[in-house]
Amino acid sequence: MYGYTHDKDSYLRRLRRIEGQVRGLQRMIDEDNYCIDILTQVAAATKALQSVALGLLEEHLSHCVAQAVAEGGDGAAVKVREASDAIARLVRS
């Protein structure tokens, strides 16, 4: 079981809300809305996705990585490397 599962419903609600934002963006473009208004909504959707990503990363560190470290062995190094790679991807995005 993964660390985020206790907040699964919350994550799903947030992702559904983001999905609605993206559908709204499609509608705005279809309706020829003003560029800046669309960009403002793109920024809001991007920020919402970043918030989900940071929450999942926090869950990964506090559950998956912490558990692997407590168990010892090579699994800890693998989990730390995965977390480091995920952080690098988030920073680049």
Placement of each model-derived feature along the sequence:
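Solvent-exposed interaction patches of small proteins and small membrane subunits
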Residues: 1-93
